[in-house]
């Protein structure tokens, strides 16, 4: 059986800044589990397949991890009897209290011993294939991946194949060329054959048919072209230039990569190395076979130069501008021929040397986690090409388990983990219940994790020269070892520490030193845009919109420059206002000015219908929930703010007949609110709307819409306190969705806890913030 492990480092090429607190990985133990437990796992796998067929639910429920942690906790989840409200029965205090207690008990049971809540953070079908390609070209695929790994990786790909035979870019998406080609290639590299696939339904052959019916792999978007070129089943001549020489320009250069969004910068960095070296792996019999399998004409007859701008229409979301195509053509026809010849090839060598220097620095400062799975796979490819026997390659291999996640739908590569983000949201949800004394042990563990996850030092040396920012005092999305600042994680973590500081230390643990709070404030104030007043994610926003014209991805939007985001801005307002409340006098004027600018940014970016567009969740419901919470913390209310009134009106106008809310993922690329098909309800999104309405004062004015939504949540709760997994609710870059498996527990608990506190409990002393 598979076992989830955590807070351990068992490899000489692993190292940590905090003794691996927050690390999570999976290990196969052949002798683990009773026959009954193994049967439960198989049942979970069958239930997933049936649920997907009957109800169209693609995301996993994380059943393998949950079953393990629930058993290890020893908590009896069925000791509180289930509760259902009849059609004509109204919500009452006892009903909501029972639902909250059951949800709290489940959350205690699935909390890891180091304080975080392990959960899948995945959903993209573009995450895993690059890693498999990296392992294949380096000859390590059979040493890093066991038979059990391969079996579960294959299971995942088969489970998420679409009816038409193709695969999407993410698990709920329509079939695309990049999703289909990469999934097909991955299956073949893992040993699946053409004649008959293990699923008994000819899945490999059906996938190949979709690819050929839609023009063949030559139409794969640019990221896919790079991956295939490294594997050796596409020619570099068919890729638009990614010159490493760009890294040699002074930082004042208008198009210097240092001005790019960190994830874009760090992804294209190893891409430019691989392009500059024209590297490809060994041309094996399987590679030669793939060359013939995925194209409509013989490989030798393909005119590669004509494929540089070729992108399948099913994939195209962000078309190249004419200016961009002229830039690529100019580099391809004029620069590249010179850089291949002496003496200009010396410039290429200098560019490659600089890229290697930057890759090494970035990998070291993230403990070889890198900024995410995209860079991770590309760095593995690059270090294999640079020095197969080097320590960098070995360090990278040692961190691969951190990216592999297994659930009932199989094994996949996840982002880099959402440990900190899930923990700080869950912590606020627990605090909102007002049952702290009853469930304080859970808060004590979460408190420990949050404190241990704060970054304690800046990157070493001249980090600005290495395209990095200061980090001391910040929190990441995952754990301290990741080392990359995230604005909303820092703000929400700061608020958690401030909330917990008002509670008895014998219940929630010791407070952090106040200097740690000051350092977090320093980070937040630094991250604000001096122009707009908004906040981005990793670094201060870059007011260089012309750079977005060079977005080469075709499938993602807003990836080139660091942009402000609604939800990040709202979270920072919450964090700064909470700090000001408990620590007046420290940088008070700067905090007040910062919050005032941030509020103006939010007011300027409100949609005509009263909503706000969220970048990291779907989408208008998500953005509006965060914004109203930010406004509430800054004293903006329904009575004194037109923006709040419009936001509340948006929520009330989009509530469906059964009392819930549901928003389709189509809202994200279209940037227009789109209800779920049939105007059905999503429980997580319903919770967002409930919370947003309560932050907008709806409980005091007219709680009727909240009663309807609360009844829906109570009746949807399962006997063990869990809530059913429904549609995917996360997103990034407007056109790719992300599954946050813990959301279905965090947000219904938070919404019901806040509802119970605001509607049903008598007025009494609350926390100050």
Swiss-Prot record:
Transition state stabilizer, annotated site positions: 421, 477, 616
Family designation: Belongs to the terpene cyclase/mutase family.
Triggers of expression: Up-regulated by methyl jasmonate. Induced by N,N'-dicyclohexylcarbodiimide (DCCD) in a nitric oxide (NO) dependent manner thus leading to increased ginsenosides accumulation. Induced by A.niger mycelium-derived elicitor, thus improving ginsenosides production in adventitious roots culture. Triggered by vanadate. Induced by Tween 80. Accumulates under heavy metal stress in the presence of CuCl(2) and CdCl(2). Influenced in roots and leaves by relative humidity and photosynthetically active radiation (PAR), and in leaves by rain.
Keyword Oxidoreductase: no
A Pfam family this chain is assigned to: SQHop_cyclase_N
Biotech use, per record: Transgenic tobacco plants coexpressing PgDDS and PgPPDS1/CYP716A47 accumulate dammarene sapogenin (protopanaxadiol, PPD).
SUPFAM superfamilies: Terpenoid cyclases/Protein prenyltransferases (SSF48239)
Catalytic activity, EC: 4.2.1.125
Repeat region (PFTB), residues: 457-501, 518-563, 595-635, 644-685, 706-747
Name listed for the protein in its UniProt record: Dammarenediol II synthase
The keyword Cell cycle is annotated on this UniProt entry: no
NCBIfam families found in the cross-reference section: squalene_cyclas
Function: Component of the dammarane-type triterpene saponins (e.g. ginsenosides or panaxosides) biosynthetic pathway. Oxydosqualene cyclase that produces specifically the 20S isomer of the triterpene dammarenediol II.
């Amino acid at each position: 059986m598979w076992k989830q492990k955590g807070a351990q480092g068992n490899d000489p090429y692993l190292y940590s800044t905090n003794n691996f607190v927050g690390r999570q990985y999976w290990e196969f133990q052949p002798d683990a589990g009773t026959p009954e437990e193994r049967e439960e796992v198989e049942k979970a796998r069958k239930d997933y397949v049936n649920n997907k067929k009957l109800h169209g639910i693609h995301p996993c429920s994380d059943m393998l991890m949950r079953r393990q942690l629930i058993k290890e906790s020893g908590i009896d989840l069925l000791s509180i009897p289930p509760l259902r409200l009849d059609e004509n029965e109204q919500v009452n205090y006892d009903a909501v209290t029972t639902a909250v207690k059951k949800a709290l008990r489940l959350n205690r049971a699935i909390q890891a011993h180091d304080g975080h809540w392990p959960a899948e953070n995945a959903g993209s079908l573009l995450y895993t294939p690059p890693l498999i390609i990296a392992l294949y070209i380096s000859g390590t695929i059979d040493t890093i991946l066991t038979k059990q790994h391969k079996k579960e990786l294959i299971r995942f790909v088969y489970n998420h194949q679409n009816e038409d035979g193709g695969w999407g870019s993410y698990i709920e998406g329509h079939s695309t060329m990049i999703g289909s080609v990469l999934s097909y290639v991955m299956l073949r590299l893992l040993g699946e054959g053409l004649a008959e696939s293990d699923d008994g339904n000819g899945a490999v052959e059906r996938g190949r048919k979709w690819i050929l019916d839609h023009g063949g792999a030559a139409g794969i978007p640019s990221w896919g072209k790079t991956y295939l070129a490294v594997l050796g089943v596409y020619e570099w001549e068919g890729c638009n230039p990614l010159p490493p020489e760009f890294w040699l320009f002074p930082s004042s250069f208008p198009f210097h990569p240092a001005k790019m969004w960190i994830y874009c910068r760090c992804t294209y960095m190893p891409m430019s190395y691989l392009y500059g070296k024209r590297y490809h792996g060994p041309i094996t019999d399987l590679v030669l076979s793939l060359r013939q399998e995925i194209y409509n004409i013989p490989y030798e007859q393909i005119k590669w130069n004509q494929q540089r701008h070729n992108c399948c229409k099913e994939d195209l979301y962000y078309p190249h501008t004419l200016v961009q195509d002229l830039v690529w053509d100019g580099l391809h026809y004029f620069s590249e021929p010179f850089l291949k010849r002496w003496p200009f090839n010396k410039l290429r060598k200098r560019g490659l040397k600089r890229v290697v220097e930057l890759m090494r620095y970035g990998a070291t400062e993230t403990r070889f986690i890198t900024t995410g799975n995209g860079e991770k796979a590309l760095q593995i490819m690059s270090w294999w090409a640079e020095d197969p026997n080097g320590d960098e390659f070995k360090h990278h291999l040692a961190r691969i388990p951190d990216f592999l996640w297994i659930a009932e739908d199989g094994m996949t590569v996840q982002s880099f983990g959402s440990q900190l983000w899930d923990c700080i949201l869950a912590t606020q949800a627990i605090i909102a219940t007002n049952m702290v004394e009853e469930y304080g042990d859970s808060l004590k563990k979460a408190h420990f994790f949050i404190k241990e996850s704060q970054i304690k030092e800046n990157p070493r040396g001249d980090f600005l020269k290495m395209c990095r920012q200061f980090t001391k005092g910040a929190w990441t999305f995952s754990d301290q070892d990741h080392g990359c600042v995230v604005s909303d994680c820092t703000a929400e973590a700061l608020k958690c520490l401030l909330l917990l500081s008002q509670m008895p230390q014998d219940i929630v643990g010791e407070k952090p030193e106040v200097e740690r709070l000051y350092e977090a404030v320093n980070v937040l104030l630094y991250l604000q845009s001096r122009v707009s007043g908004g906040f981005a994610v990793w670094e201060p926003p870059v007011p260089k919109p012309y750079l977005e014209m060079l977005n080469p991805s075709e499938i993602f939007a807003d990836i080139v420059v660091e942009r402000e985001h609604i939800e990040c801005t709202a979270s920072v307002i919450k964090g700064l206002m909470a700090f000001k409340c408990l620590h007046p006098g420290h940088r008070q004027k700067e905090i007040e000015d910062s919050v005032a600018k941030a509020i103006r940014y939010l007011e300027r970016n409100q949609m005509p219908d009263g909503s706000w567009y969220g970048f990291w969740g779907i989408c208008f419901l998500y953005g509006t929930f965060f914004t109203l919470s930010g406004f509430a913390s800054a004293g903006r209310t329904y009575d004194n703010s037109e923006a709040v009134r419009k936001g509340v009106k948006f929520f009330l106008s989009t509530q469906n007949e059964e009392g819930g809310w549901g928003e389709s993922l189509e809202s994200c690329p279209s940037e227009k609110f789109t209800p779920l098909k049939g105007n059905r309800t999503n429980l997580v999104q319903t919770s967002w709307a409930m919370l947003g309405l309560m932050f907008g004062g709806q409980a005091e004015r007219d709680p009727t819409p909240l009663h309807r939504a609360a009844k829906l949540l109570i009746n949807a709760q399962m006997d063990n306190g869990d809530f059913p997994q429904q549609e995917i609710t996360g997103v990034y870059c407007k056109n790719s969705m992300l599954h946050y498996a813990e959301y279905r527990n965090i947000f219904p608990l938070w919404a019901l806890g806040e509802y119970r506190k605001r509607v049903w409990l008598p007025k009494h002393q609350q926390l100050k913030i």
